[in-house]
Design a protein with these regions (language model features):
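Extreme N-terminal signal-anchor transmembrane helix of membrane signaling/transducer proteins, especially
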Residues: 1-32
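Extracellular/periplasmic ligand-binding regions of membrane signal-transduction receptors
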Residues: 40-87, 107-110, 115-126, 196-215
């Protein structure tokens, strides 16, 4: 073989190796880029749910404040008149407001009156004693809590619940305070499904003690981000995210979980 031919072949081989290296490198960075995009996308989905939940809690706070800062409620805490009950604590109030409980407490935190409603069965039910105990033990109402509003999530025997607690004042926001008003609803499957209608993928909620939050997620691909978000991939088809949800005391209390199709990643493979 002539020297010129050998040099040409060597040159072509070198060019091929360079092109191949560039292709492999470009493909690597492209896949890395698509992985980052899909991770950011699912984290944004998590944040979107948290914002929707925050908006939901804000609406609950407004509703509870409207009732708590109201002359009729203020008078009711003095005489517990039947007219107030018949006019306000009716089934339609719970159904239209999406509420499971409306509870009244004396200034010292003692339970005074309340009603509970099963939205799925569309009927009144007894107020869970465990819920009253949770509210009182956590000091969401009573002395020291009456001067402020509290809105957020608590974990109950019946599951996660969104609650708002406000002092009971006159319509002009004068006292003396006659107790606390608490309104709340369970974050059950139906309510979560309703929130998920505004999101690209559904969300599930678990307590911190529930191992089901990570069930079926490949542990070998699971990565933690500041102990607030965990992301894992399942082949080229699915990406999962588990994220922390704080309670009313701004402490870790629940896990949220989302799963999305890896269409962005598969696009990078083509």
């Amino acid at each position: 073989m002539k020297l010129r031919t050998q040099m040409l072949l060597v040159t072509l081989l070198a060019v091929a190796l360079v092109i191949g290296g560039l292709y492999i490198g470009a493909n690597y960075y492209l896949l890395s880029g698509t992985e980052e995009i899909e991770q950011n996308s699912i984290i944004e989905t998590d944040n979107q749910f948290l914002k929707l939940l925050e908006y939901d809690l804000h609406h609950l706070s407004i509703l509870t404040t409207d009732w708590g800062y109201w002359d009729d409620t203020y008078i009711f805490m003095d005489d517990f008149n039947q007219e107030y009950i018949d006019s306000n604590l009716v089934d339609s109030t719970f159904y239209d407001g999406g509420l499971n409980v409306i509870l009244y407490f004396f200034p010292n935190g003692t339970y005074a009156y309340g009603k509970a409603y099963d939205l799925m069965a569309d009927t009144e039910v007894p107020v869970p004693a465990s819920l009253l105990e949770d509210i009182q033990i956590r000091k969401l109402i009573g002395s020291g809590s009456l001067l402020r509003k509290s809105t957020g999530l608590i974990n109950t025997d019946e599951g996660p619940m969104a609650i708002a607690a406000v002092p009971i004042l006159t319509s002009d926001e004068y006292g003396p305070m006659r107790g606390s008003l608490v309104m709340g609803y369970y974050l059950g499957d139906a309510h979560i499904q309703k929130l998920s209608e505004y999101m690209p993928s559904p969300v599930e909620i678990y307590s911190l003690e529930d191992s089901a939050a990570f069930a079926g997620i490949p542990q070998d691909t699971l990565k933690s981000y500041n102990d607030q978000v965990w992301i894992a991939t399942e082949g080229i088809d699915t990406i999962h995210s588990v994220f922390v949800i704080d309670d009313i005391f701004e402490e870790k209390a629940f896990y949220g979980r989302t799963s999305m199709d890896r269409d962005i990643y598969r696009l990078g493979l083509t």
